[in-house]
């Protein structure tokens, strides 16, 4: 019950003409099979080693050199009417609200942002967790894997925390850096390793137009710069305030210069 063949036969038995269409891609990642394969290779979820990203005209992939840079880029995409969100690995505590405000748990250097609202809670001026990806106010919170899974948005910023480190040509997991409550002490290292890699796979595949990545660990960030040719840079538009754009990769229509 529920298979394509069953539904086709049921429709034909009721006098319907059936046309079967194969869906070769997905809306996520612009339908880019290359990007989805690249993410699997990057995270060590198949037998291939990580490779450099090669633009395919479907998906934009770039590196941010700071969380501030990523945040500004994501906010600008939101101001253009696109959906744009930041997510991160579960490497920071997820506090209850301090009165009527969220706690800035996700901190990197002098930068910080709060996680999204917990599912069972409500905070003024912030969307509930199930609306985080669609409510425009969600751009001001960092989403975790439990909130981001099953959703998609146009631009996807991903902060790779210290639980995933690039060493000797591959990513390795450091479970001691994870704050995920799903990993109590008795859980086997192999299970934790797989779950953390899968969590980043979820985070890296939410974007429809493009993904921006930043790694907390300096060595990991340097490797990402090597594997991803596109970076976020500064460009002026007709004397206006500078806007963050992509250097090293083709600018998509969403933020190409418009004359007039």
Regions found by a protein language model. Give the residues of each.
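Short secondary-structure boundary/capping segments
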Residues: 1-9, 37-42, 98-116, 172-176, ...
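C-terminal accessory regions
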Residues: 136-241, 245
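Intrinsically disordered, low-complexity segments enriched in serine/proline and basic residues
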Residues: 253-254
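Conserved helicase/translocase motor-coupling segment
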Residues: 19-21, 25-35, 43-152, 156-164
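ASCE P-loop NTPase helicase motor core
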Residues: 1-27
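Conserved NTP-handling cores and scaffolds of large molecular machines
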Residues: 11, 43-46, 207, 211
């Amino acid at each position: 019950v529920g298979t394509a063949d069953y539904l086709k036969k049921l429709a034909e038995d009721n006098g319907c003409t059936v046309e079967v269409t194969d869906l070769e891609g997905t809306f996520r990642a612009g339908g880019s099979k290359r990007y989805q394969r690249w993410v699997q290779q990057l995270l060590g979820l198949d037998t291939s080693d990580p490779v450099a990203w090669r633009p395919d005209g479907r998906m934009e992939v770039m590196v941010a050199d700071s969380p501030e840079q990523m945040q500004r880029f994501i906010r600008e995409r939101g101001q253009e009417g696109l959906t744009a969100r930041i997510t991160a690995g579960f490497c920071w505590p997820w506090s209850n609200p301090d009165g009527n405000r969220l706690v800035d748990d996700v901190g990197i250097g002098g930068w910080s942002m709060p996680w999204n609202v917990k599912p069972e809670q409500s905070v003024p001026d912030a969307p509930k967790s199930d609306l985080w990806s669609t409510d425009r106010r969600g751009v001001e919170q960092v989403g975790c894997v439990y909130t981001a899974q099953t959703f998609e948005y146009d631009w996807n910023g991903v902060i790779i925390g210290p639980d995933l480190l690039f060493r000797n040509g591959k990513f390795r997991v450091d479970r001691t850096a994870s704050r995920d409550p799903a990993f109590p002490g008795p859980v086997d290292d192999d299970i934790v390793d797989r779950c953390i890699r899968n969590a980043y796979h979820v985070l890296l595949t939410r974007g429809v137009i493009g993904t921006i990545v930043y790694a907390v660990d300096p060595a990991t960030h340097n490797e990402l710069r090597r594997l991803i040719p596109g970076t976020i840079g500064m460009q002026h538009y007709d004397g206006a305030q500078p806007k963050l754009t992509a250097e090293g990769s083709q600018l998509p229509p969403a933020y190409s210069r418009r004359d007039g």
